Amino acid sequence: MEPRALVTALSLGLSLCSLGLLVTAIFTDHWYETDPRRHKESCERSRAGADPPDQKNRLMPLSHLPLRDSPPLGRRLLPGGPGRSDPESWRSLLGLGGLDAECGRPLFATYSGLWRKCYFLGIDRDIDTLILKGIAQRCTAVKYHFSQPIRLRNIPFNLTKIIQQDEWHLLHLRRITAGFLGMAVAVLLCGCIVATVSFFWEESLTQHVAGLLFLMTGIFCTISLCTYAASVSYDLNRVPKLIYSLPHDVEHGYSWSIFCAWCSLGFIVAAGGLCIAYPFISRTKIAHLKSGRDSTV
């Protein structure tokens, strides 16, 4: 096999690996995870002996879980259909009253991606029970459209406006992330097709075009991943912090889906670099050979 064809085959292999990793990242939900077990243990130690025996070993006692004492009202206000409630929707329904203590927040282990946010099963028996009984949904869709939140009397109007503006900015960041990832997949697919065509027609030209498409895919992936990181940071630092931020002892971070996306970015940049750099390297070698022959003559 000629060196140019070998470089094209290597670039095509890297680009196909990149495409597989990128599609895996897009359609899996493990971009970001939270684990409040350490926070739960510290709350249990600080609250030792304060609760009845049947309420121990819980992050939040069941008697104080949101809407348990008044299910008819809760079912009218909560989204997601009749008879369903999101254990974290209490944030928007209770206002700021019961959030001054970190241990008063019902935090559960979650994982989220571009399209859904889900609760881990088998970690907290409270959320397991709620999901098995059909009271809570295990997964909720990530919003890509703006919906007007409920106006509550116990939240100041100015704070409501700030929350709405933050929701709007966060929505834009999510749209940018998903949009650029979609464009990256489309351009990468075109690059793979052009690289395949280069085996049969105008090898030098098509290889160069494929390299440009691969590098363009890398730019789109970089924009998307940086925007996703910005959206996560923005969401955790929203006002008021006692609602949206996480306690310091809650473990949270990026997971394997976003690692697949970063690996995809590395592969596609390598593929684009090979396709773009090889013609220049080969021309330099030819020029050196010609100059060597002329000098010997």
Swiss-Prot record:
InterPro entries: PMP22/EMP/MP20/Claudin, T178A/B. Residues 41-86 are annotated as: Disordered. Residues 41-57 have a biased composition (Basic and acidic residues). Residues 1-25 form the signal peptide. Residues 26-179, 230-257 are extracellular. Residues 68-79 have a biased composition (Low complexity). Glycans are attached at residue 158. GO terms for cellular component: endoplasmic reticulum membrane. Acts as a negative regulator of osteoclast differentiation in basal and inflammatory conditions by regulating TNFSF11-induced Ca (2+) fluxes, thereby controlling the induction of NFATC1. Interacts with STIM1. Belongs to the TMEM178 family. This is Transmembrane protein 178A.
